[in-house]
Amino acid sequence: MYPVMLNLQGKKVLFIGGGLETASKVQKLLEQGAWVRLVSPLYHPELAQALHQGLLEWQQRSYTYGDLAGFTLCFSHPVDPSLNSIIAQEARERGVWLNAVDDPAHCDFILPSVHRQGDLVLAVSTSGVAPALAVRIRERLAAEYGPEYAEYLELLRSFRPLVKEAYPHSFEARKAAWYRMIDSEALDLVFLGERERARAVLLQSLYSPTSPSPDGHAAPWQEVV
């Protein structure tokens, strides 16, 4: 299995539903900005708002051959799981990537157990062998990586243009700057609620203590009080 993060913003996704987890799985796709066509004989009230907002198209019926036309990504969670073999056959014929819920034999990809804190995404997979173990590991990670990491990443995001501006011609210099920043005490300060002090430490770490700024002037960290 090759791990990957997909940008689903604005992408068309087909979800063949009706199974017990249909609503929750469709909702997660919508949260990532996908436009979803749901083919399901059942009404899922949890998705009513998305239907009203036009984020979701619902066709109240069971799967029929040809439904995958025009899509590159499909999720299958039908009322009758035996349909997965037929859906997988069409997916192969059309070159569509398929995830069949709880049916790894018919999957082109599987979904990890995920913990999110803002821009931090921790994904755990057992390659389909024991998803329950992945859930337990995710729960342990969730206890360690709390909301402070979301705040920390929000702060680091604001430094991206500063790093590019400071070292516009050297990938290695940018890389070194990022590691200096990450290895600083900034995260500890975020945990203490000292965000402005954390910002000052990151700004100081942007340049090595022995190097001038690229424009020859004093590095910004030298001006921080």
Task: Identify the function of each model-found stretch.
Residues 1-42, 47-50:
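Hydrophobic, well-ordered beta-alpha structural blocks that scaffold small-molecule cofactor pockets
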Residues 19-21, 81-82, 128:
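Residue-level detector of alpha-helix initiation sites
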Residues 49-69:
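Glycine-rich, highly charged phosphate/nucleotide-binding loops
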Residues 40, 58-62, 102:
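Short loop/edge segments at beta-strand edges and connector loops
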Residues 128-225:
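An accessory alpha-helical subdomain
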Residues 36, 58, 97-98:
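Hydrophobic beta-strand scaffold residues
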Residues 100-150:
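E1/E1-like adenylate-forming module used to activate ubiquitin-like modifiers
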Residues 73-79, 84-111:
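ADP-ribose/adenylate-binding Rossmann-like module
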